[in-house]
Amino acid sequence: MSIEYRPWREDDDLRLLEVWPDAPSAPAQAFRARLGADDDAAFSRTLAATDAGVPVAAGVVYESPWHPRRLWAYVEVAPDRQHEGIGRELLARLRKVAADAPSSVTALRSRVTPGSAGESFAKAEGLTPAMRSRVVRVAAGALPEPALGQTADGSWVRSVEDLATGSVELTRAVWEFYRSVHDWDPVAEIGIGAVNRQLLSDTAGAFGALVLRAGAPGSDGPAPITAFAVSYRPFDPQDPEDRATRFEAADVLLGYVPGASSGDGSAREAGAAVETLLALLVRDYPVELEVDDSMTPLVAVVDNLLEAGVAHVVTETVTLVDDRV
């Protein structure tokens, strides 16, 4: 065996597909899409490992504009060539080329599925688990419909409003949530327009939003947002009107506004807010939510539904990090 390591070439993706199986997970599929020619504008470097000129493995390291403290890293080796040290050598070489990153960042992160060969490899190379993420499907009717609006004495408790995904108010709420749940992987300073394009635009697939407000509109304007739900659904060319079916699960970003509630009960109140919106969403249709363990109030709601048997985990991934420099 004479393994050579070289930069990526144009047809390497097609040649690797001959020796790689189908992508075993969504993270692997996403990482494969990042394999490619060197990019200096958005720093990215890909290396391939070849045996007698035939690619058998590849790896990539690249910057994340939103999370600049670490570089993403990924290595994949053909199944019949694993445990030969190829992956380890690729990663070592990627660490060296990472030193060329304009940011001078050399700390790494990667995402794997629990129990996978990728997880074992990453841990063996010194990466440690930092965050678990789950996609959870919640069944239609999983929660009773909540009471909204005015109480018997005429006072307002909470209200729900449809809000345009281009709303600055909504964008700020989503951004506050996103930043708060990524303390473990700090976010860069991103302009509000870029946040909207990335998370709430037509390009992002967002097509509707609900917000929960803490009361009724007052003379000073609308009550503050306490929770939000943004729906996404991939476009289906066979259904250009994008009609939902009874058992189709919408992809939903469900979150809360940090600090919208005060005092010791803030986490509990945030949980109640997202549970209220979730109850409205699943009245007729199931939904799928991505839940990171850092989303503590939402985790509590989802774990209760899992325990009750009205929700199940669709996928689970773990982000591992290596902060060595």
What are these regions (language model features)?
Residues R9-D11, W20-A107, G215, D220-G263:
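Conserved donor-binding loop and adjoining core beta-sheet/short helix segment
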Residues V181-A214, G221-V325:
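Hydrophobic multi-pass inner-membrane translocation pores used for secretion
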Residues A73-V75, L108-V112, L289-V291:
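Conserved hydrophobic beta-strand within the GNAT/NAT acetyltransferase core sheet
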Residues R137-G166, V299-V301, L305-V325:
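C-terminal "cap" of GNAT-fold acetyltransferases
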Residues A23, P27-L35, D40-A42, P65, ...:
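Short, flexible helix-coil linker/hinge segments at the edges of structured domains or between repeats
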Residues R88, K96, D100-T106, S110-S133, ...:
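Conserved active-site alpha-helix within GNAT-family acetyltransferase domains
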Residues M1-L35, A48-T50, A147-G191, R324:
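Short amphipathic alpha-helix that is part of the acyltransferase structural core
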